[in-house]
């Protein structure tokens, strides 16, 4: 705290049907299935197992780099015995074991050679391809066997360009029948016994030189897509879908153009989110799925597009929560709110798995009354995202509904204008019980795009959507964080800066600050004295141990801590703000990002307000005349933690400010406005809730409003009435008059705008 006072020197249509298996991990020695199968003799050599579906199935688990042989899962049969251990060629095995993962070998490679040749390849082994004279290599010349049993890179293809279509290649592990690539010629692909084909089994050479469908691959049961692979492939395809060429943009029918991220306001997209709430899911997986969808909505919104959403949950029967026809269905915040309010128990009484009914609910929202298409129906794009293990247990085959949707949207009927761009079906297989044949049948198959994915578990799926959001293009966006379970303190508070001022013979002073641009950190002026030299000021960001070089500290010209000493006020904190200018430009990353400042274009976008929004309108949005939920970031036991407080900006504002009289040195102040000027925001006290207080070392840190998943700084921590952190420990019991005061950034905007005018923040 300060000298006598307490300045605190001291944060498309999409479908989601999740059928992930409801996994419960249990030590096998203690577990007992709720079914009738004994656990005796089911253990696996070199690994362990866990029970699924309340003991009706089990999954074998092996260390990284190994896979369960001969099967990954077993089911409890009605006879009271576990399903037999059988190899891919149907031979019975007595005991399961963990075997080293190998990558498949190329069965065929046309018009070239590969080296080394081997019946199988171990993890980290490399293979190289080269072409015969007259042929050109496409794809990856060198590939590495990865820990998930897949080869890195892209399919190597040797082509001489003689065909109407280019050579479609032979993905490693597949066999191809057909070597003519003329218009309307077809090729077919096959997998070895025991492997499942993903992608298109048959591909046809089409007008324009492209192949129908998507590149196939052969999958073993232990193979999974990594979160990074899924995020890259899905996001690549998704951004292709977010806008396409419509029928009125001057391009001829069937003409393929690169689709853009920015959606034409006159265009149309519907996004249907459909979650499976059946018994096989489990509450934790259902909650995880909702988190994924929230992140997906955020991702789409970050592109500045406003599709219409539909929201459906289902088990035996579907339940429609949001219809695309509703007025608010394009409001991402409103849709997110509806999504967060859904409970897993909503389908508890009828908990079958009727994927077909869920898709029919989507079909009903796509269709139009009296079978009369509305104007512009053929410019609406549709995307379906289905998360499932493919094991629907009632209602019939859901693929028939996909066919009906294609028919409704007039897709694939006109060879010259097949309209394939207007429907994308993404299928995520989640968990060990995935039926790869079924999920592949449901997914779209498009050239150079991937629409079917298999992820290991819900944890991996959440990784996918976090990676989608946190791509490099968004690093400069203000107020964004990486709210991931694996994230560090600085992933979650990437703007937070630690400041230390070393004063010879006087020790050192600690403060906080916030990164507001690539060259500036915003903090409190009282953290420094006029005698402090730049070399004595240490600033660190992103949790890095190295200190940043300081060019200059800029004080607000109206700040003067001794300005009212003659009036008997020992310390005066009006205009208590300063900017630290760094010598070198910060490099933004996941742990170093700027916070949003009021009255900037970045905050307008963060709040999803119209581009014409004024500074006053931002103020009304962020600081309405009421109690405002906010937060600050404090360091406790070397960890950054968020503390939730309420800014008293309504009927409690006066009493909050009057409690300043309890601060040391202010007890004789007759008019509290002498020390609490209009530049201050007040937090603390016990109403409407007991607010935590700032500590010595928190000074200069940001007071933050968290809205629409973005963080906007509205204040700078300045001073407090009570020192609640004596002896380096935060007191649990504090008086009701323990208040904290923060400089309101809306009140110092002219100064901020002047000093940050070259930082490309777009002040309004």
UniProtKB/Swiss-Prot annotation:
InterPro entries: Compl_C2_B (IPR011360), Complement_B (IPR028341), Peptidase_S1_PA (IPR009003), Peptidase_S1A (IPR001314), Sushi/SCR/CCP_sf (IPR035976), Sushi_SCR_CCP_dom (IPR000436), Trypsin_dom (IPR001254), TRYPSIN_HIS (IPR018114)
Keywords: Age-related macular degeneration, Cleavage on pair of basic residues, Complement alternate pathway, Disease variant, Disulfide bond, Glycation, Glycoprotein, Hemolytic uremic syndrome, Hydrolase, Immunity, Innate immunity, Protease, Repeat, Secreted, Serine protease, Signal, Sushi, Zymogen
Location of this chain's protein in the cell: Secreted
Binding locations of Mn(2+): 278, 280, 353
Segments forming domain Sushi: 35-100, 101-160, 163-220
Disulfide-linked positions: 37-76, 62-98, 103-145, 131-158, 165-205, 191-218, 478-596, 511-527, 599-615, 656-682, 695-725
Major subcellular location class: secreted
GO BP annotation list: complement activation; complement activation, alternative pathway; proteolysis; response to bacterium
Its biological purpose: Precursor of the catalytic component of the C3 and C5 convertase complexes of the alternative pathway of the complement system, a cascade of proteins that leads to phagocytosis and breakdown of pathogens and signaling that strengthens the adaptive immune system. The alternative complement pathway acts as an amplification loop that enhances other complement pathways (classical, lectin and GZMK) by promoting formation of additional C3 and C5 convertases. CFB is cleaved and activated by CFD to generate Ba and Bb chains; Bb chain constituting the catalytic component of the C3 and C5 convertases.
Protein name: Complement factor B
UniProt organism field: Homo sapiens
